[in-house]
Amino acid sequence: MVSAFYAFLDYLKNIKTASPHTLRNYCIDLNSFKTFLEKHGELTPSPPICLLTKERQEAELPFSLLTKDTVRLYILKLMQENKAKRTIKRRLSAIKSFSQYCVKQRILPDDPTETIQGPRLPKELPSPITYEQVEILMATPDLSKYTGLRDRCLLELFYSSGLRISEIVAINHWDIDFTSHLIRIRGKGKKERLVPITPHAAQWLQHYLTHPARTSIEKDAQAIFLNRFGKRLTTRSIDRKFQKYLRQSGLSGHITPHTIRHTIATHWLENGMDLKTIQALLGHSSLETTTIYTHVSMKLKKQTHNESHPHS
């Protein structure tokens, strides 16, 4: 079964063009299930599944262990360990995807996970921040430094276009059209879309790209956002910088770069943009995903009404 795990991960990477983050999560989830199956079958533990491993050793893990009962026992074990519902659901989803792949490849005659359902998750609404909080966060980077200018530009792009971190780090020079104020974005599954940027954000971007400090360290001629060594910034480094500015700004609450994406989507909706346009701008494959912002907007309106009403 281990060789099938690797074949499945290669399929996700090369055919489905899954992101490194997605592949890392699949490795974590499948390794967890593999360890359980080895203990359940009283087998000798084998090295963890890792895409970085050049030599992939087949281990003794027969497909006869992959049954409806063993998957249910695994889910029960996770629940007994008090794993979060979201973690359990994600791990079951990884096993289901693997089983479906094996059926398509005729490795398995049928899918043993087909009727198994994970725990129901409470429907959580995104928590946008206010325009004033956005402005406070924008004003935090030190513009006397080149890195501060770069980070201000990053924050402007987050709010201007509602981009994901992975989309921002992937932007190249030829993706930007300053004349029409458009950026070509490669989203999930490498699906491309054109996203407008505000003239304000475009000015910050031009200022950053022409800064002498940037041109002097540039080693990656394609990338827009560079680290201090002139190489492309990573999603992890942007997330760390975001958290640093969040601490410096004094803003409280759980705020992430994705919060800014939720925020601008909510602001677009409140200012009259229709859901289909928001869906296209955010790169949502389903309108159902975008519809959640109507609930967020109504929640905020109710809150404002209650706070402002004299009888409240």
Swiss-Prot record:
Keyword set includes Cytoplasm: yes
Annotated active site: 164, 188, 258, 261, 284, 293 (o-(3'-phospho-dna)-tyrosine intermediate)
Keywords from the UniProt entry: Cell cycle, Cell division, Chromosome partition, Cytoplasm, DNA integration, DNA recombination, DNA-binding
Cysteine pairs bridged by disulfides in the record: none
Residue ranges constituting the Core-binding (CB) domain according to the UniProt record: 1-103
Gene Ontology MF term list: DNA binding; tyrosine-based site-specific recombinase activity
Tyr recombinase domain ranges (all copies): 124-306
Record-linked PROSITE patterns: CB, TYR_RECOMBINASE
Location in or out of the cell: Cytoplasm
Major localization listed first in the record, in broad terms: cytoplasm
Any GO BP: chromosome segregation
Record note on quaternary structure: Forms a cyclic heterotetrameric complex composed of two molecules of XerC and two molecules of XerD.
Reported function: Site-specific tyrosine recombinase, which acts by catalyzing the cutting and rejoining of the recombining DNA molecules. The XerC-XerD complex is essential to convert dimers of the bacterial chromosome into monomers to permit their segregation at cell division. It also contributes to the segregational stability of plasmids.
Protein name (Swiss-Prot/TrEMBL): Tyrosine recombinase XerC
